[in-house]
Amino acid sequence: MMTRIKTVQFVRLILLTIITFVVIQDSIACSGYKITIGNRTFFGSNHDAWFTTPHIWFENAANSKYGAAFTGSRFDGENGYAPQSGMNEMGLAFERLVAYHPAQENFKNRKTISNPTKYLKDILHSCKTVDEVKEYINKYDHSYFIEDVFIYVDKSGKYLIVEPYTLTIGNEPTYVIANFCPSITPEQNANKLDRYRNGVAFIKNGIDTTLNYCTALLDTMHVCRKKIGDGTLISSIWDLNNGTVNLYFYHDFKTTVQFNLREELKKGDHIIAVETLFPHNPEFEKLRNFKTPKNSNLIGVFIVTSAIFFLLTSIFFLIQYFRRKENKKYSYIQLLLFPIGITLFYYMIVLSGSVKVFYFPAPYKDPTNVFISLASYIPFLLLLLIFPFAVINYKLLKNNSWGYLGLGLFTFSNLIYIILIGLFAYWKFYDIFN
């Protein structure tokens, strides 16, 4: 009885571990800038994401003070889409960017943020200057956003940088931001990000507030990866003094659509799919049709199920190897299947948890985890093993020296290997020379 209970607890622990990895969302790169000349302030935003549902929507003030426009692509259930950038009627704009900050002690005696989407919308609905935003945010434990940095800009040109534990107001005529917390990031480290470095260099050559200039600046900071052409999903230029926004779709800066905030708010609350505003974009279609465990339930279930299968069968074959003392044909394969199974179990977890693996060039290199980087060579291991394993599988089918269960599990393992090799080829994991 105790053995059964321990087994159930062990399986539950495995499932919990896998599910934890599956629900982790990868960081999303973004960049932005603000430019102020005289009484004109422009705010530019690049939203780099693998989502395929970019939207712009307009919300009137209701019981709050100011109507606002927002852009975003991540659906947040009953809250609608989570805002990534936006601007209100008073010329206050913002952008949210993913950034690392080491955890510290949370703020005491402050309000908790229980609904981040509503919280971010309420700031634009309630504030008209960055000073008011700072006062508003100081009421909350904004360390809730431990993986984010925000920039707020008002039409005077002042800006507020919101980090998990720091609020900083500035008033320089230009400012460029990307995926880092400025208070803890030396300039030489920030310059390692191409989009930030390119933006700073562009501004050093001179600034103005024409739409052509602001578009060119966004263009030089956009991302487009070679593998499938993914990168910047939505770009926006917010004119904080005139209350307009120019949208650009999927790093194509030749076509833009402009909205006037006050005119749109007169139409009532409404939401528009950004894709419908622009001509057909083949690169975006490529992104939409590219399947991974993150956007395909079938592939996701297969990867998670394979992880469980590899872990359990690796243990099974190890026990089988030591349990049967008589000399069996190819018994060394059973011993070999243990490290192979553990290795593949780990790789399935990597594939379940990191979307970057599928979009960055092969072999994928993780700057923070050497084991994930090494795991990128596992597809080649399967290529080397599949033919000899298939031959041994065929011979074992003739004499069945492993027993029906052992032979069945080995055969099923080989079938999974073949499917995985096909998926690895589809994801271009073998294209290491491109």
Outline where the language-model segments fall:
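Sec/Tat signal peptide C-region and signal peptidase I cleavage site
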Residues: 24-29
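Alpha-helical transmembrane segments forming the membrane-embedded cores
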Residues: 298, 319-434
